[in-house]
Amino acid sequence: MKPSERRKARRLAVQAIYSWQLSGNNVADVEHEFLTEQELDGVDVAYFRELFAGAATKTAQLDEKLKPLLDRPLEEVSPVEKAILRLAVYELTFRKDVPYKVVINEAIELAKSFGAEDGHKFVNGILDKLVARN
């Protein structure tokens, strides 16, 4: 498996988490929608499924790790940045085989692509604090 396959899986997972957060649809329906309506060439589909389902079903646990690190209530964090942070916290917590530097770098790149102008700085700061605590 190439690193780019995981990068594409993360990109798709962030979009799915974002869609799930806003729509309120169940996880299985959102996953099905993404697997049938998105371009999946070069995507590690199994990794996408794990990241999306893991982040979506463990949201409360992930949010508890995030809340003490934030400079504002979680509800005030943009939905895009929240999706990126949930994905990254899931990987940092449950995928110990992925180096933390890779997870943080991937999250920063996702924030540059999808987030607000300085969203990547916010994401980087939060994840750096999380790694320092563990």
UniProtKB/Swiss-Prot annotation:
One GO BP annotation here?
A: DNA-templated transcription termination
The Swiss-Prot or TrEMBL record annotates one GO molecular function as: RNA binding
Keywords attached to this entry: RNA-binding, Transcription, Transcription antitermination, Transcription regulation
What InterPro entries does UniProt report for this protein, alphabetically?
NusB-like_sf (IPR035926), NusB_fam (IPR011605), NusB_RsmB_TIM44 (IPR006027)
Q: Which GO terms describe its cellular component?
A: cytosol
Please provide an example of a Pfam family that matches this protein in its UniProt record: NusB
Locate the transmembrane regions by residue number.
none
SUPFAM superfamilies per the UniProt record, alphabetical: NusB-like
Query: Which cysteines share a disulfide bond?
Result: none
| Top-level taxon of the source organism | Bacteria
Q: What does this protein do?
A: Involved in transcription antitermination. Required for transcription of ribosomal RNA (rRNA) genes. Binds specifically to the boxA antiterminator sequence of the ribosomal RNA (rrn) operons.
Q: Which PANTHER family match?
A: ANTITERMINATION NUSB DOMAIN-CONTAINING PROTEIN, N UTILIZATION SUBSTANCE PROTEIN B-RELATED
Q: Could you tell me which HAMAP family the record lists for this protein?
A: NusB (MF_00073)
Annotated family: Belongs to the NusB family.
* Protein name as it appears in the record: Transcription antitermination protein NusB
